[in-house]
């Protein structure tokens, strides 16, 4: 079935285990970026709906003095997470198709994402079970008259605000560890891609997740995201999205000294030396920038290529880029779909136009594919003749646009790689392992890829430096983002403390 023939399910907000219409009765259109057609609606939640969701989450934590969820053994919560994972796999094809319709992601990528969603729920089910073994862990003290242990308790009600580029996967990165820790959550997905997150609600209902443990409020950022960030009864906010929105979330949380985790933008480098297999390096370079239609926070969108191979490398990149199938995401073999919205489409075109006006050269792409009359499609774009003062070098485009600059020495490559306000990721491609190790240490980023770009595993931590945010998601520490550590120290001597003189001995 082609994208133009399909619609998305009609859903309401998910609050306290039930479907509820938004308080103000408004809905937002779902636009298929492939056809520009309206293919459904999502509820437009507002502050009233956020209040109801937060209240439901708080009630879920308190129910039965916490024994139903927050204080239940991690093994109990793990059963729910595994049940969710199983349902995601059961509905994998349906969910992947919905993401292709909703945000333009090629179907094969979306199907891969669903495997990752299930794997992430499974991984944090393991972490929930491991949490039982970590509870009451002893602390060695220098005084034998005391003993100490640590409790790890859920931080409370958490607000989770997620982006549109990996709609269900990015939500899962937050929902799975939060629930594993025993928190109750309110999820606010991007209004540009909320469809599969609402299907997650349906899955949670189907597996019998206790009411209020996960609530999902869709809507616009100012109407639903902002009230969630500033809500006095939300104990923590975790956000993935733009730098500008991240600043607003920090400002909203600051008056209550509320902890936040922020995974923001990037302008990541990929450094290619002259000792590489050029075809292999070209494919990783293009994958690092054009995967997910170029809409990845960690996209290695600044190519630094050694002068000795630059001409051949650029020629091969152009040939490979022209061979990428740009099409309806549901067509077999699609490798680049449309960007998510008209607004994003116009923004990317403006970046390309500005680069040309500043003197850059468009090697290939930069326009709508000739065979696609509708949809928010942009050909894979490669830009050269870049200076470090250009907007295209400094600002995150969030589209299929790669800018290229040459270097002559390793020191120059390191300097150019770090010439950014962001610090999410970086990649180095070289046959010299020691050189790769040096650059892994020198590049200022939270994630470094060697001889590849963009692999991501939920077993390894994810996060960035500088304007790419702070905190780390995933990995063994992922669950700790949603835990509060409590020290319990006990005096165990039979002797009195003896600091003050007892009145009975006067």
Curated annotation (Swiss-Prot):
Gene name for this UniProt entry: AMADH1B
The protein's job, in short, is: Dehydrogenase that catalyzes the oxidation of several aminoaldehydes. Metabolizes and detoxifies aldehyde products of polyamine degradation to non-toxic amino acids. Catalyzes the oxidation of 4-aminobutanal and 3-aminopropanal to 4-aminobutanoate and beta-alanine, respectively. Catalyzes the oxidation of 4-(trimethylamino)butanal and 4-guanidinobutanal to 4-trimethylammoniobutanoate and 4-guanidinobutanoate, respectively. Catalyzes the oxidation of betaine aldehyde to glycine betaine.
Positions binding NAD(+) in this chain are 162-164, 188-191, 242-245, 263, 396, 462
Pathway(s) it belongs to:
Amine and polyamine biosynthesis; betaine biosynthesis via choline pathway; betaine from betaine aldehyde: step 1/1
Claim: Metal-binding is one of the keywords in the record: yes
EC number assigned by the record: 1.2.1.-, 1.2.1.47, 1.2.1.19, 1.2.1.8
Q: Which residues form the active site?
A: 263, 297
According to UniProt, the name of this protein is Aminoaldehyde dehydrogenase 1b
**Keywords of the record:** Metal-binding, NAD, Oxidoreductase, Sodium
* Single GO biological process annotation from the record: cellular detoxification of aldehyde
Q: Which reaction does it catalyse?
A: 4-aminobutanal + NAD(+) + H2O = 4-aminobutanoate + NADH + 2 H(+); 3-aminopropanal + NAD(+) + H2O = beta-alanine + NADH + 2 H(+); 4-(trimethylamino)butanal + NAD(+) + H2O = 4-(trimethylamino)butanoate + NADH + 2 H(+); 4-guanidinobutanal + NAD(+) + H2O = 4-guanidinobutanoate + NADH + 2 H(+)
Origin organism is Zea mays (Maize)
């Amino acid at each position: 079935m082609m994208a133009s023939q399909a619609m998305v399910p009609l859903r309401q907000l998910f609050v306290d285990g039930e479907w509820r219409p938004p308080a103000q009765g408004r809905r937002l259109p779902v636009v298929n970026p492939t056809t520009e057609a309206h293919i459904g609606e999502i509820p437009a939640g507002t502050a009233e709906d956020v209040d109801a969701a937060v209240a439901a989450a708080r009630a879920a934590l308190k129910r039965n003095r916490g024994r139903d969820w927050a204080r239940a053994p991690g093994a109990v919560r793990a059963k729910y997470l595994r049940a969710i994972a199983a349902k995601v796999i059961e509905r994998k094809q349906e969910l992947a198709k919905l993401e292709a319709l909703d945000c333009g992601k090629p179907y094969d990528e979306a199907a891969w994402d669903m495997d990752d969603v299930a794997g992430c729920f499974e991984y944090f089910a393991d972490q929930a079970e491991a949490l039982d073994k970590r509870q009451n862990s002893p602390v060695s003290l220098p005084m034998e008259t005391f003993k100490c242990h640590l409790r790890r308790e859920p931080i409370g009600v958490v607000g989770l605000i997620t982006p549109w580029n990996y709609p269900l996967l990015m939500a899962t990165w937050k929902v799975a560890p939060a629930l594993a820790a025993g928190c109750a959550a309110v999820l606010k997905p991007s209004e540009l891609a909320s469809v599969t997150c609402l299907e997650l609600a349906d899955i949670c209902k189907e597996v019998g997740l206790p009411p209020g443990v996960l609530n999902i409020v869709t809507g616009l950022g100012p109407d639903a995201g902002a009230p969630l960030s500033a809500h006095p009864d939300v104990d923590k906010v975790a956000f993935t999205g733009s730098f500008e929105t991240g600043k607003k979330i920090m400002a909203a949380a600051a008056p209550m000294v509320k902890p936040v985790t922020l995974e923001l933008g990037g302008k990541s480098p990929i450094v290619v030396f002259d000792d590489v297999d050029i075809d292999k390096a070209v494919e990783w370079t293009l994958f690092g920038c054009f995967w997910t239609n170029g809409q990845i926070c960690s996209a290695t969108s600044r190519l630094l290529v050694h002068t000795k191979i630059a001409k051949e490398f650029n020629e091969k990149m152009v040939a490979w880029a022209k061979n990428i199938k740009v099409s309806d995401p549901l067509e077999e073999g699609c490798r680049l779909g449309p960007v998510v919205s008209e607004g994003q489409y116009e923004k990317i075109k403006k970046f390309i136009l500005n680069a040309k006006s500043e003197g850059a050269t468009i090697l290939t792409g930069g326009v709508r594919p000739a065979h696609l009359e509708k949809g928010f499609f942009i050909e894979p774009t490669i830009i050269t003749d870049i200076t470090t003062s250009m907007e295209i070098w400094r600002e995150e485009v969030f589209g299929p646009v790669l800018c290229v600059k040459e270097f002559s020495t390793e020191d120059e490559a390191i300097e150019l790689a770090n010439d950014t306000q962001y610090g999410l990721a970086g990649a180095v491609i070289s046959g010299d392992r020691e050189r790769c190790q040096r650059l892994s240490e020198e590049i200022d980023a939270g994630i470094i890829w060697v001889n590849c770009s963009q692999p991501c595993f939920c077993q390894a931590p994810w996060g960035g430096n500088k304007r790419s945010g702070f905190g780390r998601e995933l990995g063994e520490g992922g669950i700790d983002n949603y835990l509060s550590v409590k020290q319990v120290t006990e005096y165990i001597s039979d002797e009195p403390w003896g600091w003050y003189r007892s009145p009975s001995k006067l």
